[in-house]
Amino acid sequence: MKKYRDLLGLVHYLNQSIEQGKTIGQKKLIKIGDLLKPYIDSYNDKREWILLSNASVDENKNLIVDENNAYKYTAEGAHKRDKELMDLFLSDFDYTPIQINSPSELDQYTFLYGWVNGVEFTIEPEEEVEL
């Protein structure tokens, strides 16, 4: 089990690390990102459902949208939407770690720890800092 908040953090780190995809490691990160896509799509589908379910409608049940075509919300709808979005963000989902058969150049990307199998990560202990 993983949490969606951790998945979104992983996606952030992947995007920051991929850059132009110039190295073998960066190309492998792109492939890992592709394998994570079904989990990301599931989160986005659930998120969109929450946004839609709490949007304001007029007397004819038509969605009320702003000039940017974004949903509008009543104060109550916005509060309910925000609570449901936070619940989703903190919720668990079933996750099977990605098996890596050729781990070269991935050991430096320690943010993958727990998300992939087959990589020996080089995790250096943090230095203690006196305050």
Task: Specify the residue positions occupied by each region the protein language model found.
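A composition-driven surface/loop motif
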Residues: 1-131
